[in-house]
Amino acid sequence: MNGEEQYYAATQLYKDSCAFQRGPAPEFSAGPPACLYMGRQPPPPPPHPFPGALGALEQGSPPDISPYEVPPLADDPAVAHLHHHLPAQLALPHPPAGPFPEGAEPGVLEEPNRVQLPFPWMKSTKAHXWKGQWAGGAYAAEPEENKRTRTAYTRAQLLELEKEFLFNKYISRPRRVELAVMLNLTERHIKIWFQNRRMKWKKEEDKKRGGGTAVGGGGVAEPEQDCAVTSGEELLALPPPPPPGGAVPPAAPVAAREGRLPPGLSASPQPSSVAPRRPQEPR
């Protein structure tokens, strides 16, 4: 056998192998029945993942040898299983884009058991009065907030605390423990009560001091006395006013000798009206 015959034998063997590969693919019965596909059109098969490699194979193959044919993907049992489930998923309704269904406003959907009420702190003027009345779970009071609630002391408790504060402005630890047990309170309550009571007492004391100073400093000033009268001795040295008859008081000579007569009186006073002497008759 020469070389030409060997070439033709190898070419014929290669053609037979390619023809075997080009043969129809066997049909598989693993796919679903045809009745399930009635009225449903499956999507087209995806493109080949390696189109460049297939084109290179077509270009590099001999002219008398056709390229390898890829069997249809629909005959693959895995692809048929995918087609069986894909239409069912496409038939499901699409979920809404937002958290609320179409035609519904955001404020309409609410929990049926939740009562819609305004803010609790807007319903009462007291800071902590709403905590005991509010039953909503969303606005339930926290454990930390319960510590800040105001303690309501009874009259008996206030009486004992006031009596203790009257004797001691600052309470000691043993006495505080004793009062807490006796009044059914905590040490913290008694400590805070004494702190507040001391602040109130200090404010009252400051107010009293400020009021006394204002009253003492704001009094009406007494009128000043005459400059001529400065002591009680000068008042005694001054003579009484003269009688209407023009007689000189007896204290005038004494005052004249001492040189302390007032300017209105002279040293030798003369009566205002002196009777004329009668001439003596000759005997």
Swiss-Prot record:
Domain description: The Antp-type hexapeptide mediates heterodimerization with PBX on a regulatory element of the somatostatin promoter. The homeodomain, which contains the nuclear localization signal, not only mediates DNA-binding, but also acts as a protein-protein interaction domain for TCF3(E47), NEUROD1 and HMG-I(Y).
Modified residues (Phosphothreonine): 151
A single MF term (Gene Ontology): DNA-binding transcription factor activity, RNA polymerase II-specific
Keyword entries, A-Z: Activator, Cytoplasm, DNA-binding, Homeobox, Nucleus, Phosphoprotein, Transcription, Transcription regulation
Motif position, Nuclear localization signal: 197-203
Compartment list: Nucleus; Cytoplasm, Cytosol
UniProt source species: Pan paniscus
Membrane-spanning ranges: none
Record GO cellular component, one term: cytosol
Annotated positions of the Phosphoserine modification: 268
UniProt PTM comment: Phosphorylated by the SAPK2 pathway at high intracellular glucose concentration. Phosphorylated by HIPK2 on Ser-268 upon glucose accumulation. This phosphorylation mediates subnuclear localization shifting. Phosphorylation by PASK may lead to translocation into the cytosol.
Gene Ontology biological-process entries: positive regulation of insulin secretion; positive regulation of transcription by RNA polymerase II; type B pancreatic cell differentiation
Cross-referenced InterPro entries: HD (IPR001356), HD_metazoa (IPR020479), Homeobox_antennapedia (IPR017995), Homeobox_CS (IPR017970), Homeodomain-like_sf (IPR009057)
Function description: Activates insulin and somatostatin gene transcription. Key regulator of islet peptide hormone expression but also responsible for the development of the pancreas, most probably by determining maturation and differentiation of common pancreatic precursor cells in the developing gut. As part of a PDX1:PBX1b:MEIS2b complex in pancreatic acinar cells is involved in the transcriptional activation of the ELA1 enhancer; the complex binds to the enhancer B element and cooperates with the transcription factor 1 complex (PTF1) bound to the enhancer A element. Binds the DNA sequence 5'-CC[CT]TAATGGG-3'.
Gene3D superfamilies noted in UniProt: Homeodomain-like
Protein family membership: Belongs to the Antp homeobox family. IPF1/XlHbox-8 subfamily.
Annotated gene: PDX1
DNA-binding region: 146-205
Record's compositionally biased regions (Gly residues): 211-220
Motif window: Antp-type hexapeptide: 118-123
Renumbered residue ranges of the record's region Transactivation domain: 13-73
Designated name of the protein: Pancreas/duodenum homeobox protein 1
Region annotation (Disordered) ranges: 34-72, 201-283
Pfam families, alphabetized: Homeodomain
